Amino acid sequence: MRNVLYLLNYAGKAGTERYVETLVRYLNHREINAFFAYHEGGLLVERLEELGVPTRQIELRSRFDLRAARTLARLCEEWSIDLVHCQFLREHYIALLAKQYNKRIRVVYTNHFILPNNAVTRFTNRLLDKRQDQMIAVCTRGREQLIANGWKGDRIRVIFNGVDLEAWAGPRSESTLRQELGLPEDRFVMLCASRFADDKGHRYLIHSVKRLTELTSVPFTLVLAGDGPLLEETKQQVRDLGLEDKVVFLGFRKDIKNLYKGSDLYVNSSRHEALSFLIIEAMAAGLPVIATDIAGNPDIVNDEAGCGLLVEYDNPDSMAVAIKCFLEEPDFLSKCREGALRTVAEKFEVHKMVEDTAKVYELACAR
């Protein structure tokens, strides 16, 4: 059984942390023995420790931190690590540099952001590529971007994120969301759950809601769940546009299933996204989706899937018209609900993700 060290700079509560936790929950003590090292602690550390995973905090000051590379190499020797699985560029470079001090370890990197690198980083990627054992892109465009960023494509596998269908099943009547907010059962509820940061597109989403009020008389409520640096700014925007009766802020919530089950539609307004766990979870809970046409979203929402609509980023008119379709066409809403459940079962089921990732570990260790 392989000893796998998951390495993460910040062990918080976002999608990448969910990815790591999912792999650990399904692989630990079955296919691998899991270990975890991190720079800045957070909720993920607590969750992994509850699962009995050994954890260690190490300093990761920059992507070229040789001291961190030596520390990581020693930690891998102490724990007899076979493979280090990294999630972001900083810890990825450090893990590749650590191979200089510990020849045994192999490195797998999962790309969670679809962003072009600058010329210096592309050059560095090409230099380090010979040390790279395997890469995982969570969407089709992710693989294309990795190659454009200087990594060779022969060791890049596309593995979609996956969720447990049973975990998100259940009747809508289970939800207490509408009761909590004082909303009638026939109110159309849209949900967006994400961190309030610039790349999540809340400002554009709020402008879309303002435009929607001009297009329809059907009552609706937009529910926003999450926290982050732009939360207060977004609340002020809602007040400035006079949308206090249309938009509700919940803050950070752990009862995400309760929110899905109390909603009619999931909305993703991100500018950057690899392959959103939240979109897939919402679909597994039976929600159709509106998502921006960026990065991995077209792998989820497309004509074949029939689970929702793609819209242009930062185009409030496009978003408003898409929402109006679901508001005023109940048959279309029902059809997309069916498409959402079918698509998750066919393409985004957790066991496929986990099994394919375990195969990548074996490919890496065989090099």
Regions found by a protein language model. Give the residues of each.
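A conserved, positively charged/aromatic
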Residues: V108-I136, N149
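Aromatic "clamp/platform" in nucleotide-sugar-dependent glycosyltransferases that forms part
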Residues: F252, R271
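Conserved acidic donor-binding segment of nucleotide-sugar-dependent glycosyltransferases
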Residues: D303-E304, G308-P316, C325-P330
